[in-house]
Amino acid sequence: MGNGINAGRKLLENRKKFRWSDRDYKRRVLQLKRKSDPLEGAPQAKGIAIEKVGIEAKQPNSAIRKCVKVQLIKNGRQITAFAVGDGAINYIDEHDEVTVEGIGGRMGRSKGDIPGVRYKVVAVNGISLKELVKGRKEKTVR
């Protein structure tokens, strides 16, 4: 590769060519996150709670993290979402409409000791799960 006075075009072409070996560049330009993401790039999504599941925490912790299997309304994909808060799982019943968002792990991945769970429940039937757990609001009977 030349560094001469007329080498500008070649340097630019090489930069463009070798940028494709950068994983982050490739994912960004081809929009691979949006294509593979169950939420399709949106910050939140609504879904129907299918079943409650207990997921065992990773070592060295020992607990059963209460999660919910959710089928998204927009595309029918199934995801597992964590029910945040003490006793929060009791406010979620099967066939409830839940709102989910990313759990906030590194690079859009899972967080802490919950393996394979990338989402958390934010609201149940349009009411904030945090408010339900604190007892400020009551769940509507539909």
UniProtKB/Swiss-Prot annotation:
User: What is the designated name of this protein?
Assistant: Small ribosomal subunit protein uS12
Q: Which family does it belong to?
A: Belongs to the universal ribosomal protein uS12 family.
Q: Which GO terms describe its molecular function?
A: rRNA binding; structural constituent of ribosome
GO BP term, pick one: translation
Keyword field: Ribonucleoprotein, Ribosomal protein, RNA-binding, rRNA-binding
Whom does it interact with, and what assembly results? Part of the 30S ribosomal subunit.
Q: Which Pfam families match?
A: Ribosom_S12_S23
Transmembrane segment boundaries: none
Task: Note the NCBIfam families from the entry.
Answer: PRK04211.1, uS12_E_A
Q: Which cellular components does GO assign to this protein?
A: small ribosomal subunit
Which InterPro entries does the record cross-reference, listed alphabetically?
NA-bd_OB-fold, Ribosomal_uS12, Ribosomal_uS12_arc, Ribosomal_uS12_euk/arc
The task this protein performs is described as:
With S4 and S5 plays an important role in translational accuracy. Located at the interface of the 30S and 50S subunits.
Give the signal peptide range: none
Question: Which CDD domains is this protein grouped with?
Answer: Ribosomal_S23 (cd03367)
